[in-house]
Amino acid sequence: MRYCIQHATSADVAFMALAMDPDSGEWGSNETEHADRLLMTCASSTQVWAARDNAGTPCALWGVAPKSDDEEIGCVWLLACEQFEQEPADFRNLSGMVFAEMLGEYVQLENFVDVRKERAVELLRSIGFTVDPAATHSASGTLCHRVWLEAGNTRSLSLAERSAVLN
């Protein structure tokens, strides 16, 4: 499938908030809390990108916010619809392009990923993120991997790879 990546609009964010699984518990305990947390996350982000399919429907959001104790490091986040489970190479290629843009603003991207999110960890590793051994995250008490990517360490995409996924 082909996609268009642009800066996210409020309509993209609203659509993705409604598409979130309220039973996942990742962004809160109910639909309202999910939407509120996504909106707060977007508001604190310096970049929010959306991928839209051929019909113009948002299918992924990526964002980055400055780390509170070091504004040169970006705390990266992403949210994707289920269709990318059948198209992991497309999602990996799109993510690589978006993360390269983010690294134009930040010297490093990082976050903590729950060890149970194996596909997310493998996606980030395949793009070039370093995945640290699992450790208990002090803020959440959850076993997480610290993942990070420094500027200059991104997997470059050839024009052929880009044209396969971009409109």
Language model features by range: what are they?
Residues M1-L18:
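A short beta-loop-alpha structural element at the N-terminal edge
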Residues G28-Q47:
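Active-site rim helix/loop that mediates acceptor-substrate recognition in acyltransferases
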Residues S45, R52-D53, N153-S156, V165-N167:
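Charged interaction scaffolds used for protein-protein
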Residues S45-V64:
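Conserved beta-hairpin
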Residues E71-E85:
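Conserved acetyl-CoA binding element of GNAT-fold acetyltransferases
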Residues E87-E101, E122, S126:
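Conserved acetyl-CoA-binding loop-helix of GNAT-fold acetyltransferases
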Residues L109-R125, H137-A139:
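Conserved beta-strand-loop-alpha-helix junction that forms the acyl-donor binding cleft
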Residues F112, T130-H145:
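Conserved catalytic-core motifs of GNAT/GCN5-like acyltransferases
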